[in-house]
Amino acid sequence: MKGNQLELPPPGNGFFLSSSGGHFSELIYIAKRFKASSNSLILTFNGSDTKVGALEFNIHYIKYVKPRKFLPLLRMMPSIHRLMKNHEFNYIASTGAAIAIIGYLLSKIKRVPFYYVEIIARQTTLSLTAKILKLLGVGKIFVQSSLLQSSHNTYLEHPFNKYRVIKSKAFHVNGARRILVAFGTIQGFNFNRGLDLAKSIMNENDSIEWQVGFMNAGNLPGIKHEQIDRTDFLEAITRADVVICHGGIGVITDCLSSGKIPLVIPRRKSFGEHVDDHQVEIVNFLSEKGLAINLEIKHDRSVINYVLTNKVIH
């Protein structure tokens, strides 16, 4: 540590753990930011959003565990420990969620440093995982919000700070559009409110592709998928004129990386759509930068004009 600040680990072999979705996409970024070697190992949940193509790290999949269900993860700890015996690691790191606690416990057993990085969606409040880790004795963590920076929380700059919006060629806003709707793969939560808000800006001539996850979405116009293979999903984003999504950091990052400004509907705890309101935090943060539009606030056809006449560069 340098003063009160937590320093990045030296380049070497890391053991990285995360759940799926945005936690996983952030984990890949963090592994690269830590300059982890190609012998490093990533452990995550088995799902369409974690089945990436060529990756410079080894990857191991475990069964999906719903948010805040710690006991199933604890039962997996012996098998994860056995997996680690086949590798040499200089440190263990995690971006959450609850699986980070398993990573911390394993770091104590293996006597190696542990690093926790709060995902960028946490802009104003620490996650339950971060709070539990601090209670367990993790003195310092990395955060990606200047609002959370303190003597115990070291700020780690995120690539979002390098994104900016520029004008693009104009489209006729009332024309038919190719629309992709992506609501993630989280299990145990419905998002009918998101379906209704998405449909509110569509017209009958639009070509629509839906990725609805595991909720009961009923009949929808266009093509409906439960999950989309990772490669196909990125191609679908590229094809689309407009992407409507929930406030998952993974899909938002994919949109911005492809130059598109997403129309976002954050999941809210009060509607039973997620465990807390971290999606609201990231959507507010990105909306202030012009990098997203919150469809809760403005949900008519005119929002399409903004995303079609502006693009993201970095």
Residue ranges and their predicted role:
Residues 1-314:
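Nucleotide-activated sugar donor-binding and catalytic core shared by glycosyltransferases
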